[in-house]
Amino acid sequence: MGLRIFGLKMENEYGEDCDFSNWTPDWHQEVSSADFKLGDDPNLSTRGSRMYKRGRAGVMKPTGTVEGQVDIPRIGHYFRGFLDQYKFTAGSGSGMNTHEFWGGECARLPSFAATQTYDFFQKQIIGAMIDALKLEVSDEFLTFSSDWVYKTESAETIDSENYNRVKMDETDIPLMFYDVKVKLNNKDPDGVQTSFTFEGKNNLNVDETIGLGSRHPQKIALAQQREIDLSLVTTLDEDTMRTILDGEYGEVGAMEPSKCQILKVPLELTVDICEDPDRKMIILFPECLLKVEYDFSDSDTIETTINLSTMGTGEATLKDGSKVVTDMYVRIENKQPAIKPATVTKKSTVTANVTSGTTKVEGATVKLTKYTDSAETYSETTAATGVATISNVPLGKYKVEVSKTGYKKYTGTYTVIDGTNNLDVKLIASAAGS
């Protein structure tokens, strides 16, 4: 069975050296596809020959792409990376927390550390920033695609059987097309909308981050113009004809092109999950320029695409009632804490379950040694149940040794996370007790 999961957490500083042995992401996510590459094509020279005669390492412009299904708990991290403004409001009691994101004028966007597993090893990425984000839905799942640029990476081998995933502490239902509703110009659009697409780009200026003395980016890439394009697909019929003509001619009710006007409308996308109504998402584009495209072939239904380009001249109202001028605003209600860098070293409990075949092994010593500090160890002996409980273990990566006379010593690695830590170990009997 493959292990292909993506982990993400905000950095305190761009591209800071990250001790991944002591690092735990905010969550792990099973993604549909992932591709991280260094973009380090070599510099080649022919020196007048028909063949290459010299080659040297070229510049590194690392890029990545992650694609998957959207769920309410995790999608906030992607909006945190794409948009420059963020506000968190804690819920009262057991109520939902509110995360608000909107586009402003700040060119310095958040950066992240990330991990991506590839069955037998994982890439450890620093200085990761979202250059582009896409959401798309038609008649299946609401999907996302995120394009990243990053500073550099490292790799380490992993034990896929004992890889410790950070599990969500709340429902993470993947969103479907029937969870999504759209309002155009503050009302339900006429007719049936068969698909919606959002595409946003930050146009991060990577070229200016690479200079003398280093192959890879040396400073954070600043965002340039934010481009946001939207599209709704519908069909031309009696219900949608008026909307299509309004968009084409630039005025509501017009039957010929406007002399000077272009139609500006808000578009709002809301997500309400049938099985989980407390968790919600609203995406508002306060003011958009609207354009339509349509044609026909033979007797086929006339498909119409309503294209919208966002303007930074509309207003959105925050939860506290204040207003902001923006081209895009997102509100998410879930149980996730504020999206921010880690500031405190947490501890957790590790429960080791030691067996040999169907036998529970009593009296086995389970020892955890800090991966970066061999002097820091934590150990416990298994009870008659074969279970050893080790408390107050700081989060991070550890070397694992499990030993008992009459069995071969088990060695491996394990990452302690802020959550459930179940370590399953299978010992093999050995007459020599090795």
Predicted features along the sequence, with ranges:
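Structured interaction patches on ligand/partner-binding surfaces of diverse proteins
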Residues: 405-431
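Signature of extracytoplasmic/envelope-associated structural regions
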Residues: 1-349, 353-358, 366-368, 380-382, ...
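Low-complexity "stalk/linker" and mucin-like segments enriched in Ser/Thr/Pro/Ala/Gly
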Residues: 372-379
